[in-house]
Amino acid sequence: MQSAIKSVEYDRPLAAGAACGVGEAWAKVPDALAPDERDALKARIKALLVREKAVLVAHYYVDADLQALADETGGCVADSLEMARFGRDHDAHTLVVAGVRFMGETAKILSPGKRVLMPDLDATCSLDLGCPVDEFSQFCDAHPERTVVVYANTSAAVKARADWMVTSSIGLEIVADLHARGEKIIWAPDRHLGGYIQKKTGADMLMWQGSCLVHDEFKGIELDLLRHEYPDAKILVHPESPEGVVALADVVGSTTQLIDAAVKLDAQRFIVATDLGILHKMRLAAPGKTFIEAPTAGNSATCKSCAHCPWMAMNALSNLADVLERGHNEIFVEAAIAQRARMPIDRMLDFAARHKQRVQASGDLQRDQALFANVGAA
């Protein structure tokens, strides 16, 4: 497999000109609240959402209080694909995106007439930071014969350079379709997800060498030891994880697919290799089942994330209330970039809608499950 670059950095400038590295992100995580403070803030936010004609769109990885608040107020808690669809289709005047910056940008691109706010504009993503648009554009220019496919975890400027945008829940299907049509691909930025898809589809993929700070820290050796400690447990793995971790999985899939697996599989215990923020929704969806965090560090080692994204952790009730009260932290995307970026996003959404119709028409649910099932050494 060819490589685009040898390494990436997590402390690079954002496309928008701001910067917030790992250390800065952890320093900006709001302090925990006392129960009475939390209840008061939730009541205040509910009133502000009504006043501002706003809806809360939250990712599975943010704080459990934010997820619960989104559910309680008619908002959305979902993966990035469903967040994009929900924000586009909802009639709210204001979308409040609890997640990371690329999610807010995508919401604005799909809903240019709506106001899009975020609790903290510095909440970014290591994959975004590791794929600066100027370097990526130069790489694409060097391979003009290839179709450019970028993961959702990229800036609007990088999406504007792409032919397709994908999420982990539909990326395999889209790449398989492109491969069937004989297209060669540039893939960015996550090398682990790209490698997983390449192995599943056999597609000719030239990889950008980015990685997710959280998933890159999961360890295959330690996971194998944990599996032997809990032999009855099923292992659920997000495909942004390293190959050695994916190889041990019973189910490999997006956040939504992992939650579905926790509900549908008859196991009572699961080892989960993704951001621990997902455990809130898993416990709600599968009450009575036990969820164990996969290890993120080896013997005597430390972890940068400890299975939780520092930028996701920057989202909290306190800064959400402040944003709604003051109307700041609004997302803007330059018109020319937004216009170009919308094309690959719309292509993905249209493909996903057609794929869903095909699956429903055929009733071929086993095929969908097989696409994200681990087969031996993945």
UniProtKB/Swiss-Prot annotation:
Keywords: 4Fe-4S, Cytoplasm, Iron, Iron-sulfur, Metal-binding, Pyridine nucleotide biosynthesis, Transferase. The keyword 4Fe-4S applies. Its cofactor is [4Fe-4S] cluster. GO terms for molecular function: 4 iron, 4 sulfur cluster binding; metal ion binding; quinolinate synthetase A activity. [4Fe-4S] cluster binds at residues 125, 212, 309. Its main location: cytoplasm. InterPro entries: NadA, NadA_sf, Quinolinate_synth_A_type1. Its EC number is 2.5.1.72. Iminosuccinate binds at residues 59, 80, 151-153, 168, 238-240, 255. It holds the Pfam family NadA. One of its GO terms (cellular component) is cytosol. It catalyses: iminosuccinate + dihydroxyacetone phosphate = quinolinate + phosphate + 2 H2O + H(+). GO terms for biological process: 'de novo' NAD biosynthetic process from L-aspartate. Binds 1 [4Fe-4S] cluster per subunit. Gene3D superfamilies: NadA-like (3.40.50.10800). It is found in: Cytoplasm. SUPFAM superfamilies: NadA-like. Pathway: Cofactor biosynthesis; NAD(+) biosynthesis; quinolinate from iminoaspartate: step 1/1. It comes from the Bacteria. PANTHER family: QUINOLINATE SYNTHASE, CHLOROPLASTIC, QUINOLINATE SYNTHETASE A. Belongs to the quinolinate synthase family. Type 1 subfamily. Catalyzes the condensation of iminoaspartate with dihydroxyacetone phosphate to form quinolinate. This is Quinolinate synthase.
